């Protein structure tokens, strides 16, 4: 594949999903920070949801960093345009500083701030920074900020932190080959990140900063603060920050329905996404990696090149045995990402449509870790897949290629959701009224689910795979999420958190979107009365029990029954002989902790009662 390269051009102005962010003069200026006592505020939008104590008691809302769970009225205020969305706050800051960015002379250096874009290939922000430095004849300096508080607040899994640090080692080597330093700065207090970046830029004599936009609430607000902070000061002290769209193939908010609103359903959004790319082929043009720094950069910035990659912060470290296992399973860096992409497109993408739901087969790309860490851009992935299609189209030709592209596009869709419905980042379901469901907080049930000891073989196999590898097949994510939320009626947000704390590919938008779908509380959900039957799912997607045997040691000796239906391995206590049951009990394999039919009825009743409440 030899994708076309982008030529130098001026970065487009950042647009906002709703047009002019300052146009609505009626908007309230209240923030999301509540008073110490949530029941004493005169602002009704600051009152917490009536069930807020449950979310705090069970670790869903981290009060160390965030306010109480907001009321449904506050979530609705975002929908009614009464509260500014964080994207609007950042867009306003960029608009206010646009003239400065255009006119400010380059001083001694240009900085690129790496975040979740840990690659040289097809990195728009890095390319723009490189072009700026090249035009001015000054060095490009790269920066990564390690914030232990952010890792804690965002529930970053130790396995993912380890992958990120290993990727930084690869990135540092690749940059050094170009004479570009990578400075890694640890900032203990997350709120001090903008100030520390400004201090570093001042010490380097840098005038311009480039970084990719992240769409979660914390990051949008942080970058809005940074943009304004860098623009402050006397004439010779001002700095410019360009926060550019790059994470998604199509910028969130760019696609609007016929009525001018934002899409809340994937299918029409995806059709609009396809149409937009076809009409704007530059969406899939690939950015070149940066050129080398000017001669003498290494001598001038010797201290920056001497920077080492730190170890993981306390609480985010792996044991030595985990490191050995995970490093073998998950090689880090963009070279591995591109190699895996090419291998998948060469060997498996053509059969993706028919194999993608079978966890015992190598039918998927296993690229989610690279999308999450930014070692591979969605643009490169989709461009590569499209170019392998005999039609050279996104939605025509090989069915496997079409299906895979549509699955990668879900990633864009869920980030689009974060931008327009920001309260989903704040422990609220997409449909606020679903907050009124009374969930169970049965600790024994939740623990059995996390440890793969529910007595439902397909559930237990999937959860044990996570504990062993930090990864789970997407079909299984849907099955285990539905089981937790509906069979056990445990608050889906506890499962959402558990996934983020254990998955190597934990991405907030995709994880939140997936849980919203499975628990029927999110955007484009399955109706709440549709409840996955774990037995039927097991028979359909692991018919011979190969996946279950791999991960549930207690069931490996059960006889194989090709074709799945009736096989003991799917329901050993319900279908096994007395001898089989006795052997399972001796091995310690648990009986089912709930009866599916009764659990389904309980879930439907809880959903009906919750949705009938007006809280």
UniProtKB/Swiss-Prot annotation:
Residues 1-53 are annotated as: Disordered. Residues 108-249 form the Photolyase/cryptochrome alpha/beta domain. Residues 407-414, 474-475 are annotated as: Interaction with DNA. Residues 31-40 have a biased composition (Low complexity). Its cofactor is FAD; (6R)-5,10-methylene-5,6,7,8-tetrahydrofolate. DNA binds at residues 356, 537. Its EC number is 4.1.99.3. Binds 1 FAD per subunit. Binds 1 5,10-methenyltetrahydrofolate (MTHF) non-covalently per subunit. Keywords: Chromophore, DNA damage, DNA repair, DNA-binding, FAD, Flavoprotein, Lyase, Nucleotide-binding. It catalyses: cyclobutadipyrimidine (in DNA) = 2 pyrimidine residues (in DNA). GO terms for molecular function: deoxyribodipyrimidine photo-lyase activity; DNA binding; FAD binding. Involved in repair of UV radiation-induced DNA damage. Catalyzes the light-dependent monomerization (300-600 nm) of cyclobutyl pyrimidine dimers (in cis-syn configuration), which are formed between adjacent bases on the same DNA strand upon exposure to ultraviolet radiation. Belongs to the DNA photolyase class-1 family. Monomer. This is Deoxyribodipyrimidine photo-lyase. It comes from Neurospora crassa (strain ATCC 24698 / 74-OR23-1A / CBS 708.71 / DSM 1257 / FGSC 987). The lineage of its organism: Eukaryota, Fungi, Dikarya, Ascomycota, Pezizomycotina.
